Amino acid sequence: MAKALHITIFLFLISSNLLAFINSARLLDEIQPQPQLVPTGQIPTVAPTEAEEEDGTDDNPGLATTTTTASAVTVPAGPAEATEPLLEFFMHDVLGGSHPSARVVTGIVAQTEVNGIPFSKASNSIFPVDNGVPLVNSNNINSVINPNTAPLLTGLGGAQTSTVIQNTNGNSNDALSANSLPFVTAGNLPPGAALQHLMFGTITVVDDELTESHELGSAVIGRAQGFYLASSLDGTSQTLSLTVLLHGEHDQHDTLDDAISFFGVHRTASHASQIAVIGGTGKFEHAKGYAIVETLHNQDNQHITDGQDTILHFSVYLTYKA
Protein backbone atom coordinates (compact mmCIF):
# COMPACT_ATOMS: atom_id res chain seq x y z
CA MET A 1 0.00 0.00 0.00
CA ALA A 2 2.73 2.47 0.90
CA LYS A 3 4.70 1.51 -2.19
CA ALA A 4 1.77 2.19 -4.50
CA LEU A 5 1.29 5.61 -2.90
CA HIS A 6 4.92 6.55 -3.56
CA ILE A 7 4.64 5.56 -7.20
CA THR A 8 1.49 7.63 -7.60
CA ILE A 9 3.09 10.72 -6.06
CA PHE A 10 6.19 10.29 -8.26
CA LEU A 11 4.12 10.09 -11.43
CA PHE A 12 2.13 13.15 -10.35
CA LEU A 13 5.30 15.21 -9.89
CA ILE A 14 6.67 14.13 -13.27
CA SER A 15 3.40 15.07 -14.97
CA SER A 16 3.34 18.47 -13.26
CA ASN A 17 6.92 19.28 -14.29
CA LEU A 18 6.24 18.19 -17.86
CA LEU A 19 3.13 20.41 -18.10
CA ALA A 20 5.04 23.37 -16.64
CA PHE A 21 7.84 22.93 -19.19
CA ILE A 22 5.41 22.78 -22.13
CA ASN A 23 3.55 25.88 -20.91
CA SER A 24 6.77 27.90 -20.47
CA ALA A 25 7.93 27.01 -24.00
CA ARG A 26 4.59 28.24 -25.42
CA LEU A 27 4.86 31.53 -23.51
CA LEU A 28 8.41 32.13 -24.78
CA ASP A 29 7.21 31.72 -28.36
CA GLU A 30 4.45 34.32 -27.86
CA ILE A 31 6.69 37.00 -26.27
CA GLN A 32 8.25 39.44 -28.87
CA PRO A 33 12.00 39.96 -28.67
CA GLN A 34 13.06 43.20 -26.95
CA PRO A 35 15.64 45.59 -28.50
CA GLN A 36 19.15 45.27 -27.28
CA LEU A 37 20.16 47.95 -24.83
CA VAL A 38 23.44 49.70 -25.58
CA PRO A 39 25.44 51.38 -22.83
CA THR A 40 25.68 55.18 -22.98
CA GLY A 41 28.49 56.48 -25.23
CA GLN A 42 28.68 53.42 -27.47
CA ILE A 43 27.35 53.31 -31.04
CA PRO A 44 26.51 49.90 -32.41
CA THR A 45 27.85 48.95 -35.81
CA VAL A 46 25.11 47.59 -38.02
CA ALA A 47 26.04 46.21 -41.44
CA PRO A 48 23.29 46.69 -44.03
CA THR A 49 22.07 43.55 -45.64
CA GLU A 50 22.03 43.05 -49.39
CA ALA A 51 18.31 42.43 -49.30
CA GLU A 52 17.63 45.87 -47.81
CA GLU A 53 19.78 47.59 -50.47
CA GLU A 54 18.06 45.73 -53.27
CA ASP A 55 14.64 46.50 -51.83
CA GLY A 56 15.46 50.21 -51.58
CA THR A 57 16.64 50.28 -55.19
CA ASP A 58 13.78 48.30 -56.69
CA ASP A 59 10.97 50.10 -54.87
CA ASN A 60 11.61 53.49 -56.55
CA PRO A 61 14.22 53.26 -59.29
CA GLY A 62 13.77 56.72 -60.91
CA LEU A 63 12.82 58.96 -58.02
CA ALA A 64 16.33 60.07 -56.96
CA THR A 65 17.49 60.74 -60.53
CA THR A 66 14.42 62.78 -61.41
CA THR A 67 14.70 64.96 -58.32
CA THR A 68 18.41 65.67 -58.84
CA THR A 69 17.94 66.61 -62.50
CA ALA A 70 15.09 68.96 -61.77
CA SER A 71 17.02 70.85 -59.10
CA ALA A 72 20.40 71.00 -60.84
CA VAL A 73 19.48 71.86 -64.44
CA THR A 74 17.90 75.20 -65.30
CA VAL A 75 16.84 75.57 -68.93
CA PRO A 76 16.71 79.19 -70.17
CA ALA A 77 13.96 80.40 -72.42
CA GLY A 78 14.75 79.42 -75.98
CA PRO A 79 14.47 81.55 -79.11
CA ALA A 80 11.19 79.88 -80.02
CA GLU A 81 9.59 81.26 -76.85
CA ALA A 82 10.62 84.86 -77.59
CA THR A 83 7.66 86.41 -79.40
CA GLU A 84 8.84 90.03 -79.29
CA PRO A 85 12.37 91.30 -80.00
CA LEU A 86 14.19 92.83 -77.08
CA LEU A 87 15.74 95.51 -79.28
CA GLU A 88 14.99 96.98 -82.72
CA PHE A 89 16.90 99.55 -84.74
CA PHE A 90 17.67 100.62 -88.31
CA MET A 91 21.19 100.77 -89.75
CA HIS A 92 21.99 103.20 -92.59
CA ASP A 93 24.84 102.02 -94.81
CA VAL A 94 25.76 104.99 -97.05
CA LEU A 95 28.08 104.30 -99.99
CA GLY A 96 29.60 107.09 -102.05
CA GLY A 97 28.49 110.70 -101.99
CA SER A 98 29.87 113.48 -99.84
CA HIS A 99 29.27 111.79 -96.47
CA PRO A 100 29.78 108.03 -96.85
CA SER A 101 29.64 105.75 -93.82
CA ALA A 102 31.19 102.75 -95.60
CA ARG A 103 34.42 102.39 -97.54
CA VAL A 104 35.89 99.55 -99.55
CA VAL A 105 39.39 98.58 -98.41
CA THR A 106 39.97 95.71 -100.87
CA GLY A 107 38.67 94.84 -104.31
CA ILE A 108 39.82 97.23 -107.06
CA VAL A 109 38.20 96.57 -110.43
CA ALA A 110 40.96 97.02 -113.00
CA GLN A 111 40.90 97.20 -116.77
CA THR A 112 44.61 96.72 -117.36
CA GLU A 113 44.45 96.94 -121.16
CA VAL A 114 43.33 100.57 -120.99
CA ASN A 115 44.46 102.08 -117.71
CA GLY A 116 47.92 100.62 -117.16
CA ILE A 117 47.46 99.45 -113.57
CA PRO A 118 50.77 98.98 -111.70
CA PHE A 119 52.42 95.59 -112.19
CA SER A 120 50.51 95.03 -115.47
CA LYS A 121 52.89 96.86 -117.81
CA ALA A 122 55.58 99.49 -117.61
CA SER A 123 54.54 103.09 -116.97
CA ASN A 124 56.99 105.94 -116.47
CA SER A 125 54.54 107.83 -114.28
CA ILE A 126 54.25 104.88 -111.88
CA PHE A 127 57.74 103.34 -112.07
CA PRO A 128 60.26 106.17 -112.44
CA VAL A 129 63.22 103.76 -112.48
CA ASP A 130 63.70 100.06 -112.99
CA ASN A 131 62.66 97.98 -109.96
CA GLY A 132 61.43 101.16 -108.26
CA VAL A 133 58.65 101.45 -105.71
CA PRO A 134 55.36 102.64 -107.28
CA LEU A 135 54.56 106.20 -106.24
CA VAL A 136 50.90 107.20 -106.41
CA ASN A 137 50.19 110.92 -106.05
CA SER A 138 47.72 113.55 -107.24
CA ASN A 139 49.40 113.66 -110.65
CA ASN A 140 49.02 110.01 -111.55
CA ILE A 141 46.24 108.65 -109.35
CA ASN A 142 43.71 108.99 -112.17
CA SER A 143 45.84 106.56 -114.18
CA VAL A 144 45.29 104.04 -111.39
CA ILE A 145 41.77 104.78 -110.12
CA ASN A 146 39.13 106.22 -112.43
CA PRO A 147 35.45 105.47 -113.12
CA ASN A 148 36.43 102.22 -114.85
CA THR A 149 38.82 101.07 -112.10
CA ALA A 150 37.11 102.49 -109.02
CA PRO A 151 36.34 100.36 -105.96
CA LEU A 152 33.45 98.09 -106.77
CA LEU A 153 30.81 98.96 -104.19
CA THR A 154 27.60 96.96 -104.31
CA GLY A 155 26.86 97.32 -100.62
CA LEU A 156 24.53 95.41 -98.33
CA GLY A 157 21.61 95.93 -100.69
CA GLY A 158 23.10 93.64 -103.37
CA ALA A 159 24.55 94.29 -106.82
CA GLN A 160 23.53 97.41 -108.72
CA THR A 161 21.16 96.93 -111.66
CA SER A 162 21.76 100.23 -113.47
CA THR A 163 24.77 101.13 -115.60
CA VAL A 164 25.30 104.64 -114.23
CA ILE A 165 28.52 105.54 -112.43
CA GLN A 166 27.45 107.29 -109.25
CA ASN A 167 29.70 110.12 -108.17
CA THR A 168 29.36 113.76 -107.19
CA ASN A 169 31.00 115.74 -109.96
CA GLY A 170 30.60 113.34 -112.84
CA ASN A 171 34.33 112.85 -113.44
CA SER A 172 37.17 110.73 -112.23
CA ASN A 173 38.59 113.42 -109.96
CA ASP A 174 36.24 112.13 -107.25
CA ALA A 175 38.83 109.45 -106.59
CA LEU A 176 41.04 112.14 -105.08
CA SER A 177 38.45 112.97 -102.43
CA ALA A 178 38.21 110.69 -99.41
CA ASN A 179 34.59 111.73 -98.87
CA SER A 180 33.31 111.17 -102.40
CA LEU A 181 34.53 107.80 -103.62
CA PRO A 182 32.66 106.81 -106.80
CA PHE A 183 31.53 103.30 -107.42
CA VAL A 184 31.08 101.35 -110.62
CA THR A 185 28.23 99.17 -111.84
CA ALA A 186 27.86 96.34 -114.32
CA GLY A 187 27.81 98.49 -117.46
CA ASN A 188 31.28 99.86 -116.74
CA LEU A 189 33.11 96.57 -116.21
CA PRO A 190 35.73 95.19 -118.60
CA PRO A 191 34.36 93.05 -121.45
CA GLY A 192 33.77 89.47 -120.36
CA ALA A 193 33.91 90.30 -116.64
CA ALA A 194 31.02 89.38 -114.35
CA LEU A 195 30.03 91.82 -111.63
CA GLN A 196 29.58 89.05 -109.04
CA HIS A 197 33.00 87.51 -109.70
CA LEU A 198 34.73 90.87 -109.43
CA MET A 199 32.87 91.65 -106.21
CA PHE A 200 33.88 88.35 -104.57
CA GLY A 201 36.34 88.96 -101.72
CA THR A 202 35.66 92.69 -101.40
CA ILE A 203 35.84 93.95 -97.80
CA THR A 204 33.98 97.09 -96.77
CA VAL A 205 34.46 98.78 -93.39
CA VAL A 206 31.50 100.62 -91.90
CA ASP A 207 30.72 103.19 -89.25
CA ASP A 208 26.96 103.47 -89.75
CA GLU A 209 24.32 105.38 -87.84
CA LEU A 210 21.58 103.53 -85.96
CA THR A 211 18.17 105.19 -85.84
CA GLU A 212 14.84 104.49 -84.18
CA SER A 213 12.97 104.46 -87.50
CA HIS A 214 13.89 103.99 -91.14
CA GLU A 215 14.16 107.71 -91.93
CA LEU A 216 17.77 108.86 -92.11
CA GLY A 217 16.95 111.99 -90.10
CA SER A 218 15.22 110.17 -87.22
CA ALA A 219 16.60 109.95 -83.68
CA VAL A 220 20.08 108.40 -83.52
CA ILE A 221 20.48 105.71 -80.84
CA GLY A 222 24.04 104.57 -81.59
CA ARG A 223 26.47 103.38 -84.24
CA ALA A 224 27.42 100.10 -85.90
CA GLN A 225 31.13 99.58 -86.49
CA GLY A 226 32.80 96.66 -88.23
CA PHE A 227 33.02 95.27 -91.74
CA TYR A 228 31.27 93.05 -94.25
CA LEU A 229 32.83 90.71 -96.79
CA ALA A 230 31.46 89.62 -100.18
CA SER A 231 31.60 85.89 -99.46
CA SER A 232 29.74 84.30 -102.37
CA LEU A 233 30.60 84.03 -106.05
CA ASP A 234 27.04 84.87 -107.09
CA GLY A 235 27.12 88.14 -105.14
CA THR A 236 24.14 87.35 -102.89
CA SER A 237 25.91 86.87 -99.55
CA GLN A 238 27.73 89.27 -97.25
CA THR A 239 29.51 87.99 -94.14
CA LEU A 240 28.87 90.55 -91.39
CA SER A 241 31.03 91.26 -88.35
CA LEU A 242 29.53 94.20 -86.47
CA THR A 243 29.56 95.70 -83.00
CA VAL A 244 26.52 97.83 -82.23
CA LEU A 245 27.35 100.66 -79.80
CA LEU A 246 24.28 102.08 -78.07
CA HIS A 247 24.00 105.47 -76.40
CA GLY A 248 23.74 105.72 -72.63
CA GLU A 249 20.53 106.54 -70.82
CA HIS A 250 19.10 110.03 -70.23
CA ASP A 251 19.96 111.19 -73.78
CA GLN A 252 23.72 110.99 -73.25
CA HIS A 253 24.51 110.79 -76.96
CA ASP A 254 28.21 111.37 -76.41
CA THR A 255 28.52 108.23 -74.26
CA LEU A 256 28.41 104.71 -75.70
CA ASP A 257 27.91 102.42 -72.73
CA ASP A 258 26.33 99.21 -74.00
CA ALA A 259 27.32 97.09 -76.98
CA ILE A 260 26.23 93.92 -78.77
CA SER A 261 28.43 92.01 -81.23
CA PHE A 262 27.00 90.17 -84.25
CA PHE A 263 28.47 87.68 -86.71
CA GLY A 264 26.82 85.85 -89.58
CA VAL A 265 25.87 85.81 -93.25
CA HIS A 266 23.40 88.35 -94.62
CA ARG A 267 21.79 87.10 -97.83
CA THR A 268 20.93 90.12 -99.92
CA ALA A 269 18.64 88.10 -102.21
CA SER A 270 16.45 86.99 -99.29
CA HIS A 271 13.82 89.02 -97.50
CA ALA A 272 15.44 88.35 -94.11
CA SER A 273 18.54 86.67 -92.70
CA GLN A 274 19.55 85.50 -89.23
CA ILE A 275 22.91 86.33 -87.69
CA ALA A 276 24.26 85.27 -84.31
CA VAL A 277 24.77 87.37 -81.19
CA ILE A 278 28.29 86.48 -80.05
CA GLY A 279 28.57 88.68 -76.95
CA GLY A 280 28.17 92.11 -75.49
CA THR A 281 29.24 94.63 -72.88
CA GLY A 282 27.48 96.79 -70.32
CA LYS A 283 23.94 95.63 -69.67
CA PHE A 284 24.33 93.17 -72.56
CA GLU A 285 27.29 91.36 -71.00
CA HIS A 286 27.21 87.61 -71.74
CA ALA A 287 24.36 88.20 -74.21
CA LYS A 288 23.34 85.22 -76.34
CA GLY A 289 20.77 84.98 -79.07
CA TYR A 290 20.27 86.04 -82.66
CA ALA A 291 19.08 88.91 -84.82
CA ILE A 292 16.83 88.97 -87.86
CA VAL A 293 18.19 91.35 -90.52
CA GLU A 294 15.87 92.71 -93.22
CA THR A 295 16.85 94.90 -96.17
CA LEU A 296 14.36 97.71 -96.76
CA HIS A 297 13.92 98.90 -100.33
CA ASN A 298 12.28 102.04 -101.74
CA GLN A 299 11.63 103.71 -98.40
CA ASP A 300 10.61 107.35 -98.03
CA ASN A 301 13.57 109.68 -97.46
CA GLN A 302 15.96 106.83 -98.28
CA HIS A 303 17.92 108.90 -100.83
CA ILE A 304 18.16 112.29 -99.14
CA THR A 305 21.97 112.01 -99.42
CA ASP A 306 24.05 112.13 -102.58
CA GLY A 307 25.25 108.58 -101.86
CA GLN A 308 23.53 105.20 -101.91
CA ASP A 309 21.72 104.57 -98.60
CA THR A 310 20.98 100.92 -97.80
CA ILE A 311 18.67 100.48 -94.80
CA LEU A 312 18.86 97.34 -92.67
CA HIS A 313 16.24 96.58 -90.03
CA PHE A 314 17.63 94.65 -87.02
CA SER A 315 15.31 92.71 -84.68
CA VAL A 316 17.37 91.35 -81.78
CA TYR A 317 16.22 88.35 -79.73
CA LEU A 318 18.25 87.55 -76.60
CA THR A 319 17.94 84.30 -74.64
CA TYR A 320 20.19 85.49 -71.82
CA LYS A 321 21.05 88.99 -70.64
CA ALA A 322 23.00 89.72 -67.45
Swiss-Prot record:
Protein name as it appears in the record: Dirigent protein 9
Domain of life: Eukaryota
Species classification: Eukaryota, Viridiplantae, Streptophyta, Embryophyta, Tracheophyta
PANTHER family in alphabetical order: DIRIGENT PROTEIN 24-RELATED, DIRIGENT PROTEIN 9
GO BP term, pick one: phenylpropanoid biosynthetic process
Chief location: secreted
GO CC, alphabetical: apoplast
Location(s), subcellular: Secreted, Extracellular space, Apoplast
Annotated family: Belongs to the plant dirigent protein family.
UniProtKB keywords: Apoplast, Secreted, Signal
InterPro entries attached to this UniProt entry: Allene_oxi_cyc_Dirigent, Dirigent
Subunit structure, interactors included: Homodimer.
Task of the protein: Dirigent proteins impart stereoselectivity on the phenoxy radical-coupling reaction, yielding optically active lignans from two molecules of coniferyl alcohol in the biosynthesis of lignans, flavonolignans, and alkaloids and thus plays a central role in plant secondary metabolism.
Covalent S-S links between cysteines: none
Extent of the signal sequence: 1-20
Species whose genome carries this gene: Arabidopsis thaliana (Mouse-ear cress)
